[in-house]
Amino acid sequence: YRDVRFSKDKSPYKTDAAAWFYHRDAWHAVCTAAVHGGAGFYFQIAPKENIVAGGIWMPPGEALKTLRLAIANNHEELRAILKAPAFRRAFGALSDEAVLKRAPVGFDPEHPAVDLLRYKSFTVSQDLTEAELLSPKLPDICAKKDATMLPLVRWLNRLLGLPPHSRRLRRAGAAGRR
């Protein structure tokens, strides 16, 4: 909320609507400094900026350290996800909005995965056209894009100790609560 009664600039504080879908086991950790909310999916509608995105954006220090250590030890798995033909067609590469210029502290600048270790966020996104946004098939369009991101999201969550979600787990959990 932005009080604009006495302001010359009457533009609203926020001009977009967004939704973040994160791991079911991470709900208690969202927006806390000590713990991360895990990787997930993001949907945004804004003037001239409608996107579907996924991954983990600016994780706290401990989560970022965990991810970097895992990448340093097994970067081939992440590279395989990023080089998958469907993934490359849809997203190209990881977003480069938050990348260090040099290797992070504690990592060898000559490490074969230094290009991946420099990332501070592990996200991908794709713009939605106005036709897609206004289409009655928008949920299907987003689901298809999210399915393409799913290997990255699952890989990140697995490294952070969040197991993959499945219908079987959901049914078993619901049955146990009755």
Q: Which residues does each predicted region cover?
A:
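Aromatic- and glycine-enriched beta-alpha-beta binding-site module
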Residues: 2-73
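Long, solvent-exposed, polar/charged low-complexity segments
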Residues: 91-178
